Amino acid sequence: MTIQWFPGHMAKARREVTEKLKLIDIVYELVDARIPMSSRNPMIEDILKNKPRIMLLNKADKADAAVTQQWKEHFENQGIRSLSINSVNGQGLNQIVPASKEILQEKFDRMRAKGVKPRAIRALIIGIPNVGKSTLINRLAKKNIAKTGDRPGITTSQQWVKVGKELELLDTPGILWPKFEDELVGLRLAVTGAIKDSIINLQDVAVFGLRFLEEHYPERLKERYGLDEIPEDIAELFDAIGEKRGCLMSGGLINYDKTTEVIIRDIRTEKFGRLSFEQPTM
């Protein structure tokens, strides 16, 4: 599955982010806790250089908690502070400012020693589309400032947002790479809804989701669709799910498009519980 999706505003965002780094104290890199590595754009490393950073594992309520802990340890071992958060209900957000102060303490101590008046922390929020940047900003600012939605790419311009007296945030459009080198990265992004459904082969995504569930969460798969056993043949598995869910056409034939929609919707709406689609060792 080849996915290419790189709107012009994303290329512009990269240039503007690079320019704004001089104004920034710290970067909040927002990733999807279900796919922390796949939801990181490799070129972000090149853009950020050695800027202080906090990795925010968003949508942690949707991810397998044990796997999320593995990821936090993985990033900490790389010298990157990481926090589990939920930008929708605010879980973990109260840790962001204290963690930022701790990381930036030496910098602000030097500023005070030079007689520079203390100011708010200036942070840049960066991440791929649909990872929850706008929702996070709105939650922190307690206002509906940034546009939000479940369509990837909804934030199209950069803006500064004041969060109390201690923090100023710069939101950026989601930055996605031009072409996925690894097909699995594209599939993981697609199954979690980070890529527009209109540009992907949804049946490929459903097959990926089923195979993943079969390998890592087989009991949940059987329970959800009332299966005694999971057929080895993927077509038979589709047939079984389509039949169980009433995805039928005239003559009793399986409607594969409808079955595909059911599978993907069930995954995205947590009908299988909390799922993590990659681990640090994968």
UniProtKB/Swiss-Prot annotation:
Belongs to the TRAFAC class YlqF/YawG GTPase family. MTG1 subfamily. This is Ribosome biogenesis GTPase A. InterPro entries: G_CP_dom, GTP-bd, GTP-bd_ortho_bundle_sf, GTP-bd_ribosome_bgen, GTPase_MTG1, P-loop_NTPase. Interacts with ctc. Interacts with the immature 50S ribosome subunit. 2 molecules of RbgA bind to one 50S subunit. It comes from Bacillus subtilis (strain 168). PROSITE patterns: G_CP. It is found in: Cytoplasm. It holds the Pfam family MMR_HSR1. One of its GO terms (molecular function) is RNA binding.
